[in-house]
Amino acid sequence: AAFIRMEPEFNPPMSGSNSICVATVLLDAGIIEMVEPVTNFTLEAPGGLIKVKAECSNGKANRIYIKNLPSFSNALDSVLEIEGYGAMNVDTAFGGDSFVVVDADSLGFRLSPDEAKDLAKLGEKITQAANEQLNFYHPTYSDWDHFSFCHFCGPLLGGKKGKNFKSAVAIKPGKIDRSP
């Protein structure tokens, strides 16, 4: 099965949250045969193939896991000038789409729901500044030459089940996405 995610300005090569939604609909609607307790299949997005593993029971997809497109860092420790904030160090990366990656702690964010409006506003400024001041390069998709989103990352924490961190992704127009 294939899908295309359409945006007002561009059509992203891949979307993690939309891949999860598409996989759920394909299974729950019976478009793809469900095998309980686990169904494996492949989705095709404009950027490439996405492996899907779905945990299923009672005719419903309960949990979806995806293997994203190959990811890479584009640049580390780049300096951006942001109006009202001054100079800021950022990384840039590709993980199904192009991101400006920012240390939320260094900007005073805890990544809590009450900060969503401020994160969305600043994220738009950061993404715009990156598109004006930095270059994005994808080795396969040469026409993908812009930054789509700002990914605010919290500190990496260790736990019994591995490492994790809080994050928030600012998307247009001034919103926070549910997944990076």
Predicted features by range, described:
Residues 1-14, 19-180:
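Active-site proximal loop and beta-alpha junction motif in alpha/beta enzyme cores
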